[in-house]
Amino acid sequence: MRMYRLFIAACLILTFSNIGFTQQPKARRGGQEQNTKGKGRGGGGQAMGSAKKMNLDPIANGNCVMGMPTDHSITASIVLEKGTEAYVEYSTKSGEYKQRTSSFVAGAESPMEILINNLSSNSQYFYRLKYKLPNSTAFIATNESWFSTQKKSGTSFSFGVQGDSHPEREGKMFHPMLYKQTLDSVAAYKPDFYFMMGDDFNIDRFLSNPSLNKSAIKGSYQLQRKYLGNMGANPPLFLVNGNHEQSAKYLLDGTDTNVAVIAGNARKKYFPLPAPDAFYSGDKDTVEHVGLLKDYYAFEWGNALFVVLDPYWHSDVAVDNQPGSQEKQGKKDQWKITIGDAQYNWLKTTLEKSKAKFKFVFAHHVMGTGRGGVERAPFFEWGGKSPNGAQQFGQYRPGWALPIHQLMVKNKVTIFFQGHDHIYAQQSLDGVIYQSVPNPADDTHTAFNKEAYTSGKILPNSGFLHVSVGQKEVKVEYVRSYFKQENLAQETTERHVYTVK
């Protein structure tokens, strides 16, 4: 009975109490903006509720996260007690479940990845998990959830994006109940998938105590599963590597006990991430003790191309923060920071070959470090200039055709999404929108690093971005999250919407 209660509390249930939703405002065409001030429950798509502490029990039996959707398959990562028998049943019609996977028995407490294959493309599926605990004769069915296979070109769809969640910074820029509300709001919008922009698994604080690395890093990833197992049961997740994950080349030392290896393996263990195949392109190189990194990748969906970049696994130096180091970012030689030749050539080929009308590029931040958006774009391998203004791209990146920004301009990238700065900022440079994505659970509602932004629409935390992709235009909506209370500043509740053609 206790296990069943845990399952009900934390498995695939989407709880919509404590949330308020309204009809989304219609954005004007032609790239114009529309701002709407939220007014309590019913204003601006906000997530409301009481600031009650969230109970974080161990990951519940049946906790499920979806990933790696294709035109014919999807992968479910499921936590099950050892000896539990289970299967997934599904159908294109709600409540019918005419198809099912083979039964499987959990061999350990670690998540199991189950491939749901031979699906129809451009289709919505409804599914539920059924499982039978050891020494039990009855199967337990989870609530119904859903997913979509690849949308064909010309079909409208939506996706979501959140910035750095930083669950280790509770009281400073994270509140567990606000995070839950944001994720519940995401599920209610029903995007086809959801991007997390990095700094969701902070490993920095464990670097000074190697004896704690494995258990501590495992705990960081388990913590996110407790939240994402609810929301993630609907939209599949795509992760972007951040600086605080410390999944980084500079830490490699040839052993299987260093932080980068442990973090890289935990990332793949707890979340189903894309590897190069017939549907996804990406990083084909392997790292000793980790294998495929699954760090950068690309795919097409509907009228759009999605590209995820990563400098951390490909730079010989610490890209951003190196715990214990007193070196300031401004004194670093950022020509040493790179996505590497292989990733650059892959990016160039991917952008040039795609015929998608809309192209979206994701990275934790411009160059993986610093603050600001378009303010950072002119420099180093991103824009070609050194800090003194000298154009030195050819000297430092021989063989590269163009700096990354110019490559995006030439290939008509629609939006570049980044996290890291803990702020909402929409800017434009040479026709490319630079979109900084806000924290999803900052109950202080601060516009961190605002001073680094000299242009654009700037708003404080918190919430997520809901992006609707149509045949002719893209609509981006900043869906705000806050607790229902009095005297909130307008900039805390203001919903920002813009369109791109």
What spans do the regions from the language model cover?
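Disordered, low-complexity segments in secreted/periplasmic proteins that are enriched in proline
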Residues: 21-50
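Metal-dependent phosphoester/phosphodiester hydrolase catalytic core
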Residues: 42-448, 456-459, 466-501
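Bacterial N-terminal signal peptides
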Residues: 8-17
